[in-house]
Amino acid sequence: MLKDLFKKSKYATVNPSAYKSKVVEEKPNIPSGMWTKCSNCNNMIYYEDLENNKYVCTKCNQHFRISPKERIKQIFDKDTFKEMWKSLKTNNPIDFEDYEEKINQSQSNTGSKEAVVTGVGRINDLEVACAIMDSFFMMGSMGTVVGEKITRIVEYATENNLPILIFTASGGARMQEGIFSLMQMAKISAALARHDEKGLLYITILTDPTTGGVTASFAMEGDIILSEPNTLVGFAGRRVIENTINETLPESFQKSEFLLEKGFIDSIVERKNMRAYLYKILILHGVNKYE
């Protein structure tokens, strides 16, 4: 009997590597790109649902950043937008190291030559000139080509008595082009002043993010300034300001809702309503139907 107490128990033997391989084999095969996570609420969203909802989170209403191509699709009448100066590209004016590689990488990623798309299109048959900045191209930074294209479309609008819409999305002036990028602020503002002298309408639509030299110039010069919800709008970064003034800023600081409260913008418009809202403004300002 005592002998039986000291007998070794019999255990089943498990091969961990065999078990692991079995688990891996049994994982469901989910195609990549089918789901995406909201950066605001961490909700997992079925990509098709996100696309059908104009790239707005179905849970918290966070507006995802979108490309100029998608913006054109949402705002303009089908097949009416005609892009202008598509082939313009930078030539690295100050020979900044690795700049060409970064430009080439952005061109490959986005399929665009630069960080802004300019052209003319129609909203319910009302013709407008438009510039749409691309945050996916070097964070929409403003260099010589971005400045030139926006200036040209503003001048085109002035010559043809058209209203101008600018959808801003930018990290500011492009450091790789030095003083040449900063010059674009004054250049675009001067073109907009000539547009204003003719009594023509300029509408700015601030989208996430709108910062730096773009905010300090043409983004805040619109006759009417609109914004998408929860858009980051500012000049210097939050940490820079806090370190400078030695104070903690409010959580809502530099958000479009904060700017609306302080009177810096006129209205916050959800993406699903933007096309209709712009149409109403154009009608109220006497914009004529396309002929």
Swiss-Prot record:
Pathway: Lipid metabolism; malonyl-CoA biosynthesis; malonyl-CoA from acetyl-CoA: step 1/1. Binds 1 zinc ion per subunit. It catalyses: N(6)-carboxybiotinyl-L-lysyl-[protein] + acetyl-CoA = N(6)-biotinyl-L-lysyl-[protein] + malonyl-CoA. Zn(2+) binds at C38, C41, C57, C60. GO terms for biological process: fatty acid biosynthetic process; malonyl-CoA biosynthetic process. It holds the Pfam family Zn_ribbon_ACC. It is an enzyme of class 2 (transferase). It is found in: Cytoplasm. One of its GO terms (cellular component) is acetyl-CoA carboxylase complex. GO terms for molecular function: acetyl-CoA carboxylase activity; ATP binding; carboxyl- or carbamoyltransferase activity; zinc ion binding. Keywords: ATP-binding, Cytoplasm, Fatty acid biosynthesis, Fatty acid metabolism, Lipid biosynthesis, Lipid metabolism, Metal-binding, Nucleotide-binding, Transferase, Zinc, Zinc-finger. Its cofactor is Zn(2+). SUPFAM superfamilies: ClpP/crotonase. Residues 34-291 form the CoA carboxyltransferase N-terminal domain. Belongs to the AccD/PCCB family. Acetyl-CoA carboxylase is a heterohexamer composed of biotin carboxyl carrier protein (AccB), biotin carboxylase (AccC) and two subunits each of ACCase subunit alpha (AccA) and ACCase subunit beta (AccD). HAMAP family: AcetylCoA_CT_beta. Component of the acetyl coenzyme A carboxylase (ACC) complex. Biotin carboxylase (BC) catalyzes the carboxylation of biotin on its carrier protein (BCCP) and then the CO(2) group is transferred by the transcarboxylase to acetyl-CoA to form malonyl-CoA. This is Acetyl-coenzyme A carboxylase carboxyl transferase subunit beta. It comes from Clostridium botulinum (strain Eklund 17B / Type B). The lineage of its organism: Bacteria, Bacillati, Bacillota, Clostridia, Eubacteriales.
